[in-house]
């Protein structure tokens, strides 16, 4: 796709696409993020397109013969969105802003991957003007118009309305009671000042965190149409002087314990 690696360097200084994330708690071991960079002409600003690449693995205690949690919608659909946007945006003229394409590990384990990324970013977080996280957009949500995606925290910043004006099939999250803005990898970034939201079409289907979240249930024509609506708006965001901002009183704050 013409991307530069943005992960760890080896002893010879060669960059990898993989950013390893140490895991200090059980189950021990390691997870990782994957980072690709489409270098822009202005090194002072960047945008980020992200998803999480993990799911729940295998559960031997699950009822029935199928013990594998495939996670087709949650969140293989988001990882595919990041890859397809990289495919669409990579060729041709370089954008003004650098675009970071990031897939986080271990979102399902307390967001370990995104938290490590925040503590070890490939670029200062102050230079990331926006992050769009993609999560569960493999099926249409019956609560919104056909072919439409929704944005968590739509009312919090000027980013969602502006992307919609630029042609994105994007509306406000129809499930505010679910608090999805706080439940995805966008939230740790938002707490650090990045204008970060999640794009989704999750209609609260019954396959959430079940072994039945299978690729056979993905609506590929819907994914294709809805993601295609984002290509020009994201390209515009990468080339414009528009800088997203939280609206008055809407910047997220860390929950009190």
Roles of regions detected by a PLM:
Residues 1, 32-102, 116, 122:
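Catalytic-core environment of secreted peptidases
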Residues 1-8, 84-94, 119-123, 164-168, ...:
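Sec-exported extracytoplasmic/periplasmic mature domains
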Residues 1-2, 13, 17, 34, ...:
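Stable alpha-helical elements in mature extracytoplasmic
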Residues 44, 94, 104-198, 202-207, ...:
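Metal-dependent peptidase/peptidase-like ectodomains
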Residues 87, 91, 206-257:
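His/Asp/Glu-rich mid-to-C-terminal helical/loop segments that flank catalytic regions of hydrolases
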Residues 19-25, 33-34, 63-75, 90, ...:
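Second-shell loop/turn segments in exported
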Residues 1-38:
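A non-catalytic alpha/beta surface segment that caps or lines the substrate-entry region
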Residues 95-106, 131-137, 243-256:
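Acidic/histidine-enriched alpha-helical segments
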């Amino acid at each position: 796709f013409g991307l530069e690696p943005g992960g760890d360097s080896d002893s010879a200084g060669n960059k990898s696409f993989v950013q390893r994330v140490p895991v200090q708690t059980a189950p021990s071991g390691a997870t990782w993020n994957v980072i690709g960079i489409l270098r822009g002409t202005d090194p002072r600003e960047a945008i980020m397109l992200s998803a999480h690449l993990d799911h729940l693995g295998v559960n031997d205690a699950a009822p029935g013969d199928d013990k594998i949690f495939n996670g087709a919608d949650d969140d293989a659909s988001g990882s595919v969105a990041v890859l397809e946007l990289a495919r669409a945006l990579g060729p041709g003229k370089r954008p003004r802003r650098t675009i970071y394409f990031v897939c986080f590990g271990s979102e399902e384990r307390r967001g370990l991957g995104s938290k490590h990324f925040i503590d070890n970013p490939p670029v200062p977080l102050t230079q990331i003007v926006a992050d769009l996280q993609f999560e569960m957009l493999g099926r249409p949500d019956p609560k919104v118009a056909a072919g439409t995606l929704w944005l968590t925290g739509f009312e919090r910043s000027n980013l969602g309305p502006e992307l919609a004006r630029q042609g994105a099939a994007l509306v406000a999250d129809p499930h505010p009671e679910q608090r999805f803005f706080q439940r995805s990898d966008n939230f740790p970034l938002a707490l650090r000042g990045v204008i970060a939201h999640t794009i989704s079409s999750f209609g609260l289907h019954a396959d959430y965190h079940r072994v039945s979240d299978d690729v056979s249930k993905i609506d590929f024509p819907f994914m294709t149409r809805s993601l295609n609506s984002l290509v020009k708006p994201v390209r515009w965001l990468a080339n414009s002087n528009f800088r997203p901002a939280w609206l008055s009183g809407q910047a997220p704050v860390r929950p009190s314990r």
